[in-house]
Structure formats: structure tokens, C-alpha cells
């Protein structure tokens, strides 16, 4: 199964109210590292970003995201623009066949010259959010998302229809079991 599919499938499953997937995965011997299930309430700062929009099926998720990030990074390098933060995926919609996303990299200010047509400049989502930290493989994000879903349901929080993953470790060079991903759940 592709590396991101399991994590993002859980978001879809949680949206349907099927929160028992964590127990099923535990029985399937998926190795995970526990997170702090409380989440940390923060105010997410809106930042200028350069991003590539895309859509992907679940079986091509990881490759689609990597290609999008490579495109953004190549533009920033060519334009001499330094990133001001970690790469992030902003999931704008999710369903059983795939998802729509923005593969974004924060910058200090919008570029003076517009990027090529396959890229855009915008602002990352800002405002009240819950921050969770996932440590481990993409496959183990399923349990992390299950814990997040339980927390949001238990606290009866009204989450927005967007999800953000911020990659604090390099997706290409970090051993998969050493990945660190900040997961932001914007709330109303």
C-alpha cells in the first residue's frame, strides 16, 4: 500500500464516524508510537506560501506529493527564494478514491514575479487549531489519526474541512521509522 494512503484513508473513515480502525490495525500488527492524545491548542499563523495544487488517487499518493514538492522546490531554487519553514501538505478534500491537496512551502513574502502556471502563491490556513505530533512511518499515521479523531469527537470540537501535515523531517532522506510530522486540525 502506498506510504500515505493509510493515514489519509483514516481521515476519510473518521469523517464517516468509523473510529474503530485503530483497534483493527493494532490486531494487524501495525507498529506505532503513541502520541499525546490531547493535542495542543495553538493559533496557527497564516504564512505566505508557494504551492502546487494537485489531486491524487490513493495508490499514487506518495509519488504525487513528492513530485509536487519537487516542482515547488525547483522553482524556489531557480528564483533564489529561501523557504522560511517546513514543507506542508494542505489536504483540501478527501474521499474514498483520493484527495485534493496543496503541496506548499512557506516563504518570507510572495514572490515579486509570478511563478509558472503550474504553481501558485497564497496563504496557508491560519487560526485556531489543534497540533498533534506523529513520530514514525506513514503507515503508522493511521493510529495517530484514529487518536486525533477520538479526541475531537470526545471534546465535541467542530473541525474545519481541511487538514495540514507539516514535515519537520525530510521525506526523501529520513528513514521512514524516524519521520516527524506535525498534524494540524483547524477548528472553529
Feature annotation, model-predicted:
Residues 2-6, 17-188:
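A solvent-exposed interaction/effector surface
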